[in-house]
Each structure stands twice: as C-alpha cells, then as structure tokens.
Amino acid sequence: LRHNIGYCSTGSYKGYIIIPSYDGEGNLNYYVGRSYYKSDFPHKNPTASKNVIGFDMLIDWEEDINICEGAFDAFGIGENTIPIFGKFMPKKLKAKLIEKRPSRVNVILDRDATEAALDVSQHLLDNNIDAYLVQVPEGTDPGDLGVDKMKELIDYAEPLNLMKIMEMKFEL
C-alpha cells in the first residue's frame, strides 16, 4: 500500500504492473509500467517529462538520501530512496537537494552508469553536499540484492572528494 502499486488487466498497459510516483503534495508526477509476464518490452513508461522527484511524497529530507535508477532498484534499497527513472539527475531533484541540504547522499546507479554516477556525485560535492558512491557488484542491481545487502554496501561506502572522482573517471 505504501507505493500504491497497481495492475492493468485492460488497455495499452494490459499485463503491466504500474508503479506511481507522487510529488511532495501527493499529486501523481510520474509512473512506470513493468510487464508481469515475460515480454520483449518489459518496461513501458509514459512520454511525460522525467524532470520529477521520484517518490518525493515518501522522502524524509532530514535523513540520508539514496538516489538510484529505477523504481524496483528503490524497492531493493529501502527507505528514503529516490529513483531518477534513468541515469541522469533531474533538474528538480538537483534544486531540491541544494535547498534541503541532506547530510549525506548515497549515489547507487548500475555499474554501466558509473560515469553518470560520478557526474551526480560531483554535482553534489560542488554544492557542498556529502556524496557517497555505492557500487553494486558487476552484473547485479539493487533490486536483485535486496535491502539487507544494500544496507551493508551503503554502510561500507566511503565519502567521495573531487580528487577521487577525477581518478575514477580517468580509469573509465
């Protein structure tokens, strides 16, 4: 019930699980569709702008924030996790992070998005927000690993600095 997940039995989303996202006032700001059955098209997303703060209504901005790619990744990470519905941080999220200034932001993108994760981290550091790059093992994602393993990876993540980001970008 927390995420208000639904299922479509008719229409263009027939056979898809629908995961809605709500803004801070409780208004629908985005949704993702995921096929319940094996499909050539497992994801079906709207053509709407992704310049939203995913699951904003569920975020406690006074606590540490987790940023990840998708809704199912967010479920695998647990509380206070914002899916960015892709690899790039939306402008609205950038602005809200600067406004709210959380004490720690854990950046948790898939391994194939390491460069994007470093860019997100650099933006946070440029705005004096502590960034931690949480790297999931190759070939997995947070949704595969689950909350307990993700908590362990988050707990062991070290804070980034600009020098470390540059070193990591050079190694890509």
Where in the sequence are the language-model features?
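Short, aromatic/basic amphipathic alpha-helical patches
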Residues: 116-128
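Acidic, metal-coordinating catalytic cores used for nucleic-acid/nucleotide bond scission
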Residues: 88-90, 109-118, 141
